[in-house]
């Protein structure tokens, strides 16, 4: 059983005050009652932070936004949940930062120079998606069973599944149609008699790996579109490759070429520690590429 300690609502809001600040790290004095890896809101602008250390009378929080202007005595509010991301149709064709804040939508509301404390939903909660329900009343479902299929793009069908740690009998299903990511699709009766409403959305802690039923062996080659790599250094689908090299030897450019031309259905580009001009190139060029399939 996977314990995610995700709470739909928190009955008692826990708060604390800032005792000290050191760059992106803040310190809270006393017994705060906060949990390790818990998401918190810091200061008047409600900057996003995460509890990274707990001592007897000192709580350490890392803030994921600029801390300039914060001062001791400002309030820190606990959410009762770990730092999590929203998994649902609409993730594809988006640009997110490391905690799934949608940078394009933030730029629309706050401008190109993103200000602190901007709160925007990660995904569009008003868009309706054509949905095909794959279960019926009376079915007994386990974690990972598919309850609905949503064509997210012309090439990718998003399969909505029962969340990990959940199983039960289907009480209610909706008819095929168009629904938002928060609309009820299936209602389950759990073994303890409670009910659980399932939507297209799952909230998942960023530090908890997604569970797998089993892994397939890496036996099919990944055609990268780069002849020297496909001939001399073949990569397997499901495998891992590394590009070592010194400064200016073309590591990033090779990565860009593989991302552009590899025989893959979905490309997830993660830029960590990249130069600003290289990320700009990714955003400009990748957005103009057309999948010939």
Regions found by a protein language model. Name each.
Residues 243:
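Hydrophobic anchor at the beta1->P-loop junction of P-loop NTPases
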Residues 252-293:
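Conserved P-loop
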């Amino acid at each position: 059983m996977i314990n995610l300690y995700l709470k739909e609502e928190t009955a008692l809001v826990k708060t604390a005050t800032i005792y000290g600040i050191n760059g992106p790290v803040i310190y809270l004095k006393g017994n705060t009652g906060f949990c390790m890896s818990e998401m918190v809101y810091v200061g008047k602008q409600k900057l996003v932070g995460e509890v990274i250390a707990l001592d007897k009378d000192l709580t350490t929080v890392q803030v994921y936004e600029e801390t300039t202007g914060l001062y001791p005595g400002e309030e820190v509010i606990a959410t009762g949940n770990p730092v999590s991301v929203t998994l649902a149709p609409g993730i594809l064709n988006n640009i997110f930062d490391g905690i799934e804040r949608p940078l394009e939508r933030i730029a629309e509301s706050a401008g190109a120079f993103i200000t602190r404390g901007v709160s925007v939903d990660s995904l569009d909660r008003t868009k309706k998606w054509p949905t095909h329900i794959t279960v019926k009343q009376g079915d007994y479902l386990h974690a990972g069973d598919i309850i609905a299929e949503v064509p997210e793009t012309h090439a990718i069908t998003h399969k909505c599944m029962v969340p990990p740690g959940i199983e039960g009998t289907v009480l209610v299903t909706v008819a095929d149609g168009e629904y938002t990511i928060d609309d009820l699709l299936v209602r389950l009766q759990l073994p303890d008699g409670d009910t659980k409403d399932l939507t297209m959305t799952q909230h998942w802690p960023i530090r908890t790996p997604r569970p797998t039923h089993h892994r397939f062996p890496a036996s099919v080659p990944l055609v990268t579109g780069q002849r020297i790599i496909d001939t001399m250094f073949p990569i397997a689908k499901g495998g891992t490759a590394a590009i070592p090299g010194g400064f200016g030897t073309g590591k990033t450019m090779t990565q860009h070429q593989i991302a552009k031309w590899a025989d893959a259905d979905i490309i997830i580009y993660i830029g960590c520690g990249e130069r600003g001009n290289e990320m700009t190139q990714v955003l400009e060029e990748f957005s103009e590429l057309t999948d010939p399939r």
